[in-house]
């Protein structure tokens, strides 16, 4: 325990643990600035489940390390749950689901509402906010630069999709490790009105196979089972800091409930941006 009293102080500890703080660029989650380059871990309601994922697995580069820090924690619940990605991958590599993720890759989906149409598709963000403009041609240019497919909805909203490989080559182990952001699957909204009334493809974000086929109930159960075998909960106390090698450890957050007067304030900062190496051969 560091004894820090505010998560904004996390940046003071980066040199101590030997990492270089970077801006959180390219992330698709909604976050609040907590000071010192530290962001909130997310804005998802406490009663929803955040599935296991490596940070920014959907992007063309990712942070080599991520640091979590705790300022305030509830008496019970609110843990961050981590899992050894090497062990999870080993459990998946001989399954049909693991093979499909490796062979087909992943398609990420983002849906944005139109700030000028309050009667359109509901989402957690507008395309004006996401792309920081009000000009559709600028959105087209940004998507083209990123290699994203852009569709303008009839209500003025935007649907963005892009493909990425499901595994990443890890130089340290010489192995391919699962690198799919399961937390971006549309089931994240199953208990989150009004988004749970939408089809998965219309929810704020979703994940399918790269060919557009959906992960089946069996696929999701296979992934859940693999992760559940190797989970380790981090029971937070104020002043705690945890540093994870991003490709080596997934993180997730089960639902929790705050009692009257309780708060959960966890910060995140990212470091050492690393370009994707992607899959090197045909074997998992």
Which sequence ranges carry the predicted segments?
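Active-site environment of non-heme Fe oxygenases that use a 2-His-1-carboxylate facial triad
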Residues: 35-39, 46-52, 61-284
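N-terminal non-catalytic cap/leader segment that marks the start of a structured domain
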Residues: 1-64, 90
